[in-house]
Structures are given as C-alpha cells and as structure tokens.
Amino acid sequence: MSRAIRLVFAFVAVSIGFFGGMPMSYAASTTVQTAHDFSFTSIDGEDLPLANFKGKAVLIVNTASMCGFTSQYSGLQDLWDTYRDRGLVVLGVPSDDFGGQELDSAAEVKSFCTINYNIDFPMTDIARVKGPEAHPFYKWVADAHGGLAVPRWNFHKHLVD
C-alpha cells in the first residue's frame, strides 16, 4: 500500500475516532437525519443523491485543481481503484473557497482531473464548503460536529457510512 493511501487511512481513522464520539447537535426541527438525506449535483449536471451510496462507506473530499495538495487526487484514485468493489466510494467536491484555487467551470475541472489524474470516481459540480453559502451537507456536518468539521483548506475529508 502506498504511503499516500496509508496517510489517508490514518487521517480518516483519527477523524472517525474524534468525530464519532461527538454528540449530534443538529436542530430537531429538520427532517435531515443522516448524510444520505443530502444530494449534490454531479460534475456532469445530474442529480447525485448520497442515498445512492447507502450501505457503503463514502469518503467526501473537497478538492481544488490548483492547490499544493492537488496531488492527493492520485491517492484518492488509488483508494477508489482498490476498495470500490468492497464498498468504498470516493466523492470529490470541487470548491473554490480557499484562495481561488479551483478552475472556473465543472467542465474544466472534469477535463483537468481526467487528463492529469485519470480520475473516474464520482465528482460533484463546484460547490461551497464553508460559510453561509455552503452546500447543505457541509452546513449539516458543521452544525452536527462543530467547528473542527468545517473545512479549513482543500482536501478536507469526511467519512460517512
């Protein structure tokens, strides 16, 4: 197993250990119960409900094409190639929230990822991952798990089952 994959697994394991024991504080007035209640728009413009991945582990990663961490795409693709048949889904969420490091359109992101990293794991359209305009999934995670769950930079990871 490559060093990058081991590092991703170590990070995810630490995150699960930390966030797994935190109480849910999401408002009872909402009908959202799990991550599977959310939907993204795919990089191709199609509806992409997280419910499609029920029963699988989903590693949700906010990405950026022009970041110093962009090389993590290689490790994420390795994870997808190695574990997708065993129930792991890698979901890339391109975001321009940190330093303007994402390309201007979903088509450009898809082309960049295909040409440079041969990415074939599912990806969403460009989305906000922090602040008042954040995608509802990211708002829910922040509310449920507090400030440490809010991405502070690109390639922040959330593992959901």
Cite the ranges covered by each PLM segment.
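N-terminal secretory signal peptides that target proteins for export/translocation
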Residues: 1-4
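N-terminal "domain-start" segment that seeds a small globular fold
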Residues: 24-51, 71, 136
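Thiol-based oxidoreductase modules, predominantly thioredoxin-like and allied folds used
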Residues: 87-105, 119-131
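Thiol/selenol-based redox catalytic cores and closely related redox-interacting motifs
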Residues: 113-114, 118-161
